[in-house]
Structures are given as structure tokens and as C-alpha cells.
């Protein structure tokens, strides 16, 4: 069997759509699984949109996702002379002809058309969709060269596939109609027709094509929002394919080993932002503990805290932690609590602000719901008295105090006001772990302040 060669052939516009990058992922995995070549072709014939900046955005997205290509980047604009030479061949063989056409703007010019066969059936076996067929008479002749002399997508695409020796074309099923036309061009040129695999589209929860109206639709947006490239890669792979069991989080090596085009789903794949966020959280959990801890330390610097020093691992609200080993242990404990709960890397500084500074915002809705209720002030002051007597300031000891107060009726009436009083938020890491991290002095001071300024009598 000859070497398998696949290509990703986007038209750079400055933004890379998740549907396009999923096609790149499938092409890349197929090449790696079969030991073939993954080629990158930049279809840059739209000179207004395919700027150097737009092309660089494409490269950056692919490198961020680990989609490395095997040969020099192929630029379609550099092959225009060859495209037109092939058009001349088609004209000479009678497979193309020139005709005068008037544009929508009223301009008249000569357009080169491809002559479709008038009888017979165009057929191919799609690796994903199965046998596909269409009567030749149902497809009209189509343009391959504009009146300005520039080659159109159909001819450029086929010629470049021939020149790059592409054996398999894996692309979206919005190209199925183009494929019938392209097969006719391949045959007219006496070239071998590649194998095709058309991928189902990505849809929203209403079954319509996923677009920016449904949320982030471009790779760059996910990068800015704190998604890990491994998570986005993994999730997009599963939009139309699975390993044959219930595994969802896979290593890159497992993906390469297991990926087969024959297992790609025929039906449309629904994009679920919540599932992607969950997967991102799973990949965040895989970050080495020390690495994640140091991310937190650095992010604390953005909150104006002296805790941002990696050298000292300072803990500005805990002067009682005098030894470096104690401070590192404090950061390790905080990181462990946050790492298992966080879904995104953006906003880490904000999520730990209450641990590194007394200057943190209060969520007004949480204050209204949890603190501005009758009896909350007395509840907080009672807790201050009880917490003052705790000898071992640890999560288990503090939880025992609240459990005793609740008398088996649930700790919610105490837990929620305490959380808002000491952190300004209605959610976060475990409350008693939070109190252990804040330490005795900070916890008691914040409870007193909330009782005096925020809580209702």
C-alpha cells in the first residue's frame, strides 16, 4: 500500500472555527495512526482576507493544539500558474470551454467552465457515510476560472491534491456536492481519485449549525477563556468519534492508537459547552501539583498581594507561618483544594483573592441571601465565641463545632453565612478547609466585621 497522505486546507480569515480544527484533528490522527503524512495547505487565494496576520493566527492555533505538519506549508497562491496550465489541458481535451458571462454588477467577461458528463452516475464509497451516488445529468457545468483569469476553488483544490499526492480527503459534509464535481475533474485529468471521508457537522442543542451565536466558536476564544489545548483537542475528537468504550479522557498516545475513520459517526455531533468545561476541569486536575501551586502563587501577585513571590512563598494573611516549609505547605493545601474544583485557568487570582488579601469584593446577591436575614448577626457572634475556644485550628475541629450547633439538622444555616462573611462569595472550596487556610485571626476578624456591618439583627 502506498503512503497515506492527508491534508488540512483552510482558508485563513483571522479566526479558526472549531469545526475546521476538528477536521484538522481527524486528519492529523489518521496520519499518525497509519504512519502517513499530515500536510498543511493554506488556501490563500482570497487576498483581502488571507493576510499574513490571519495566516499566523492559523499557525498559532495549530501549534497550540499540537497539530504539527510533516512537510513545508503549501500555499495555494504559489501554484496558480500550474492551475491555469491544467485548465488549458482541460480546454484542449474538450472537458472545459469558455463562455461569455455577465456578472451581478453588470460587467461582461469570459469565464471558463468545466463540462460535466451528460450521462452516467458519479459514485464513490465514503469511509464515513458509505456509498454515495448522483446522476451526472443532475449536476450543471460549473466555473473553474473567473473572468479576471483567476482559478476557482474547484480546479485549484483538485490540482493541489494531485500535486501533493493526497490519498485521503477528510473534510466536512458541506463539501459532499463539491466532491461529485471534483471526482469528475480527477477523471478528466486521468488522475487517481482519493478516498473521501465526510464529517458530520457540529450542531447546537437545537440541531442547527453551531455558530458564534451559540457561544465561543473559534479556537482563539477558548484559549483566552482558560481552556487547556489538551482538553479542547480531546473534546473535539469526541464530537463524532469514540474509542469503543466509556472512556472520555484520553492521552494523545491513546488517541493515535485507537483512531479509525471507520468509527467516525454519521450523525451530527451536538456541541455541549458544559461537557467541554467538565473536560477542561479533568485536564486541570492532571497538572502536576507543584506546577499548579506555582500558578496560584503567581496569580496572587496580580491581586496586589506580596504572596506572589515564588522565592519566599509568602502568605500575607498568615504571619504565624514563619518557616518556608510551613508557607509552602499552606500553598500546597490551597492549591489542592482549588485544583480539584476549578474548570478554567483564567480567574485564578480572583478565586484566591480572599486568601491573600483582606481587600476582596462581596457578591451583593450572596450577602442579601445569606447575611441580611433575621438572626444572622447573633449567629455570627456566637460562632466567634465558639471558634475562639478551638485549640486545634483545623478543618475537622471547626466542622465539629458547627455540627454540634446544628444538632443533626444540617449545617446549611451556619455554613452559608460563614462562607459569605469570610470570602464574599456563596461558593468556593470546602468551608472548613477555607477557615483552616485563613487562620484563626483572619477568620474571627472577618466574622466580627460581617456581623457589625452586613448581617441583620
Task: Write out the residue ranges for each language-model feature.
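N-terminal Rossmann-like or analogous alpha/beta NTP/dinucleotide-binding catalytic cores
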Residues: 1-101, 106-108, 137, 177-191, ...
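Small-residue-rich helix-loop
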Residues: 289-300, 313, 317-406
